[in-house]
Amino acid sequence: MVKVMISVILSTMVMGFLGLTVAAQTNRRAAELKKWRIHDETRPLPPIVDPGPQQPSLPVPSDAIVLFNGKDLLQWTNSKGAPAGWQVKDGYVEVVNKSGSIKTKRAFGDCQLHVEWATPSEPTGSGQDRGNSGVFLMENYEVQVLDSYNNATYADGSAAAIYGQYPPLVNACRKPGEWQTYDILFRAPRFDGNGELLAPARMTVFHNGILVHDNQELTGPTAHKARPPYKAHADKLPVSLQDHGNPVRYRNIWIRELQP
């Protein structure tokens, strides 16, 4: 009995310590954010980490909702609700320039999202014009997709950045043409009945299996050249993928809804 009590106490202490550590890191990054203008070219770039060789896709969890099955876009529409105009072939879907972003027919709040993506194997352009797209949670909160392999750009717009806010902790990008993974744990913002913010959105993100955001608190919706404040919105909204004019590919997209 004593051993059990000691084990419980130690576990509680460890969890409390981890919670304080994450909170301290979040506060530190929030303080650092104030130092930098949005898309500041002088902001330090994240250190490069080799994620290792590509790995085969993992099986889809039994309780997951498959958003893209490699065959069709029946789960998606364009931004106006019409059929999605991207090209499906060979088990992936590719952005068609000027066809517009696409979004899921279903809406989601708190979730675990898995996305696999690849930029063109023969890169063209540089900076933000090289393999640019984005994964949007609730159509408002973007994790940047970009070819960041030997391709410098502003830090808060690099691959796996919470766009316009936080660069990834490291640059874990693979070579152009290689398949990459995002695993995103997302907690939606909370608003009261008057539309006042009760709790901000948070993200934990793994890029190619490497932690790049650790329960990071978002300052508001992500945007280009702006950091707008939160505005009340529905508890659940679609996931969307961005058409930024580059032929980025996606495959094996699934989501698990989480309890609040």
Functional labels for PLM-detected ranges:
Residues V8-G19:
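Bacterial N-terminal signal peptides
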Residues A23-P260:
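Carbohydrate-interacting regions of secretory-pathway proteins
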Residues V4, G19-V22:
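Alpha-helical hydrophobic membrane-insertion segments
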Residues M1-S7:
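Positively charged n-region of N-terminal signal peptides that target proteins for export
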